[in-house]
Structures are given as structure tokens and as C-alpha cells.
């Protein structure tokens, strides 16, 4: 009887292990939209009309159109793009890409980056390394602090 109970426990733990590992392989983004198109042969998902994508770190990307290339974990957001992280930082632009593998967000055109603690960065074509939390741009940018001081 004890051997049978041991076997049941071993099977139970093996199942838990596989279920846990299966969840780790889940999709990188949870995407919702009014209209969703899937190109299975290219492994691409296209969302149109009030699209919202949420990644595993809780970062939320909202746009008029989102194209997600699943194989390379690359997301393209276009039209009224708003990216919010868990700390409350908000990035707004008209077009952005998110390279999930390298954890890099790149914006195209005018960009506003509002930090949760009141700081504001306005610029163009900004690259944001989300792991190191470093913003870069080769264009003229303006940084404003909470007291209204401006650095260009």
C-alpha cells in the first residue's frame, strides 16, 4: 500500500513539474483587438482597432494597429501608441517597435516619455533599453523636471 501511495505522489509531482514548465512557454503577449488577422504561414498576428497588448512584465501597449511577429518576438505598434509600465511611466508616439528578445523599445517620430515621478522627456526617434532603463536618441530632446527646469 505504501509503495502505491509513493507512486501516486511521484506522478503528482511530475505532473506539477510539466504543468509549471508548460506555463513558462506561454505566449509573450496577451493581445486583444476589435479585429484580429492571423497569418499562420508567417506566424504573424495583426490586431486593428483599439488594440491592447500586455507582456509578461505587465507592460501594456495600446495602439490603433499592432503587428506581432511571433517567431522573432517582435511587435510593431502604429497609430496613437501608448506604452505604460508597472511603475506608471508612460511613453506616447505615433509608431513604436518592441523587440521582446532584446527588451528594446524604439520609437519613430515625435515621442513623449513621462516618468511616474513627474519628469518628462520630449524628443524624436528614441530607443529605450527596458532592462537597463536607458533612453537614447540622436535627435534633439528636451528633459523637464518637476520644478520646470529644462535641459536640452
Regions found by a protein language model. Name each.
Residues 2-12:
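Bacterial N-terminal signal peptides that target proteins for export
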Residues 10-21:
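Bacterial N-terminal signal peptides
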Residues 26-152:
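Structural signature for solvent-exposed beta-strand/loop edge elements and short helix-capping sites
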